[in-house]
Amino acid sequence: MAVATAGTVSLARGAVPEQIVPVNPEPGSPVFTRPSTATTTGGTAATSSYQGAWGTADAFATLMAQTYGADAVAAAQAAGINPDTLAAFGQIESHFQNVGNTSSSAQGVWQVTDGTWNQYASELGLSAADRSDPVAQAKVASAIISDYASAVSRSTGAPATGTQVYGAYMFGTKAGAAIATESNASTPLSQYVSAKTLAANNMSGWTVGQYQQTVASRMGSGASEAVTS
């Protein structure tokens, strides 16, 4: 289930586009829909390479087993995010399969939609011709994750974890930040996410705690690691 991502990247943008929302319960054959309402938050990607510890998350070894693994790690470091986080997002989004889907424009290992790809790719000097390249996908996903981590961290006042940032990746930065700061695990997830989106993801009736535990279990040990150093 996807319950739900060389050289220094320096991006400045007025709004972070909402990201894809998975609706298919099986990894490797994801289907995605867009949130019913857009959520935007200003953000700036990291301007220095990632300096924290990494390489021990469950998904990392699987990422490194891919032909593009080392380049994906370099992309994450250049964007200032934890390579373990990029690996965990790739695992939960597609199980590292460079695939599209039949119901939306989401594509690639990190299942980025066309609109999001076009904005970030342009700012990274990439083009539509790079859309199917997992290395280019890693650069775009890393920039997106960096922006989302910044948005969540502004709300929590602390470095965001993989689980917290994935909430923004899945539901948009506003809902993701609210979920990350919710201290009561019994709070209904519907307080922050529309009933339509929850139903599409088979999450109707879920609590915040249930959602976070499910994401963490599917993301692996990288779920609890800080996304930025």
Regions flagged by a language model, labelled:
Residues 3-73, 115, 122-123:
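N-terminal export signals and maturation junctions of secreted/periplasmic proteins
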Residues 41-96, 135-139, 146-156:
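Export/targeting segments at the very N-terminus of extracytoplasmic proteins
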Residues 81-84, 107, 162:
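Extracytoplasmic
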Residues 87-91, 109-113, 167:
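Structural recognition of the beta-strand scaffold that forms the well-ordered cores
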Residues 100-122, 184-189:
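Short, surface-exposed glycine/acidic/tryptophan-bearing loops
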Residues 114-178:
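Alpha-helical segment that forms one wall of the substrate-binding/catalytic cleft
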Residues 161-216:
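Catalytic and substrate-binding regions of cell-wall glycan-acting enzymes that process beta-1,4-linked
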Residues 209-229:
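A hydrophobic membrane-anchoring alpha-helix module
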